[in-house]
Amino acid sequence: MRTITIIRKYGPAALFLAAFTALSGQVTNSKYTDMENLSTKEFPALPYAYDALEPYIDARTMEIHYDRHHRAYFNNYVAALKGTAYENMPIAKVFAEISKAGDALRNNGGGYYNHVFFWRILGKGSAGPSPELSAAIDKSFGSFDKFREAFSNAAKTRFGSGWAWLVLTPDKNLAVGSTPNQDNPLMDISPLKGKPLLTIDVWEHAYYLKYQNKRADYVEAFWNVVNWDEVNRLYREAVK
């Protein structure tokens, strides 16, 4: 009965993940409650089925993106940590010293963290920014529409591969910007600094199967699958 429920509610991919977890123990809890102390012992589970974001992000893209690209970053990050002074260090502290840690930790640690964060802010059915976040958006950008335009432009104009971000800056304002490759706003080398609240992956592997070279179409589709409940929670935690 439980198997039937899983299939009906979440799809076959979720059943596979549940079975994989039970048999191997290699996938951990999908809540990702502590981003600054991500586990290097277990690869985090995707928090929904591969087809959960259809039609905006297709199931095949999600499968390849999560199980190949993201998993490779995790494995390579764990391997790069071994035997270094950073081996038992929380990932946020590694990022704070990433200029000294080297490219292997920068690229793979960034790829691991950024994807976990990306999965958690995606989802369907949330209502939108909370009153508190809406007020902060209005203060920093003038309106939600202006914020959305700024964020979308950061994503569309990032040359080559990278990420666009909404962050809470150290002075408690909201800011939008982008980072190259697998850099993120927690890294000491990033011009954009702050606590991440929202992101979009603009590497071609994130959208090419469905959108080909039309990154702008992918960015516009992204707004249909923002998990505002999680973004609101992140904002509440960040302003404490």
Ranges and model annotations:
Residues 1-28:
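Bacterial Sec-dependent N-terminal signal peptides
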